[in-house]
C-alpha cells in the first residue's frame, strides 16, 4: 500500500473532497485509511467503565485508499512510485519527482 501512517494526503473523492489532512491509521489488509477529520460518523456508544453515561460519539471512519493522494513537502498531490536511491527502495511523487520517505 502506498500510503503510510503520518502521510499528509488530499481527499480526491467523496463528501470531504479537497480536504488535506494526516493519515491516522493505515489498514493494508482492507486497502483503507483513517484520515484525521474526514468521514466523520456518529456512533451509538453503550455505557462502559470508561464512559459510564454512554451516548452518541463522533469519530473518523475508514475511506478507501484510492480516494486519497499523497502530498509532498511542497503540497503537490500526485501518484506514488517506487525507485531505488543508494540501494534503498523509497517512495516518490510521480508528478513532482520528490522523494517522500
Swiss-Prot record:
The keyword Repeat does not apply. It comes from the Bacteria. Keywords: Ribonucleoprotein, Ribosomal protein, RNA-binding, rRNA-binding. It holds the Pfam family KOW. One of its GO terms (molecular function) is rRNA binding. PROSITE patterns: RIBOSOMAL_L24. One of its GO terms (cellular component) is ribonucleoprotein complex. Disulfide bonds: none annotated. GO terms for biological process: translation. CDD domains: KOW_RPL26 (cd06089). One of two assembly initiator proteins, it binds directly to the 5'-end of the 23S rRNA, where it nucleates assembly of the 50S subunit. One of the proteins that surrounds the polypeptide exit tunnel on the outside of the subunit. Belongs to the universal ribosomal protein uL24 family. Part of the 50S ribosomal subunit. This is Large ribosomal subunit protein uL24. It comes from Streptococcus pneumoniae serotype 4 (strain ATCC BAA-334 / TIGR4). The lineage of its organism: Bacteria, Bacillati, Bacillota, Bacilli, Lactobacillales.
Amino acid at each position: 500500500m502506498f500510503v503510510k501512517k503520518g502521510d499528509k494526503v488530499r481527499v480526491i473523492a467523496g463528501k470531504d473532497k479537497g480536504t488535506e489532512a494526516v493519515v491516522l491509521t493505515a489498514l493494508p489488509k482492507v486497502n483503507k485509511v483513517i484520515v484525521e477529520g474526514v468521514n466523520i460518523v456518529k456512533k451509538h456508544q453503550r455505557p462502559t467503565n470508561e464512559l459510564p453515561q454512554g451516548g452518541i460519539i463522533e469519530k473518523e471512519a475508514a475511506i478507501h485508499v484510492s480516494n486519497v493522494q499523497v502530498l509532498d513537502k511542497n503540497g503537490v498531490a500526485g501518484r506514488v512510485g517506487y525507485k531505488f536511491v543508494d540501494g534503498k527502495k523509497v517512495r516518490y511523487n510521480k508528478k513532482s519527482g520528490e522523494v517522500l520517505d
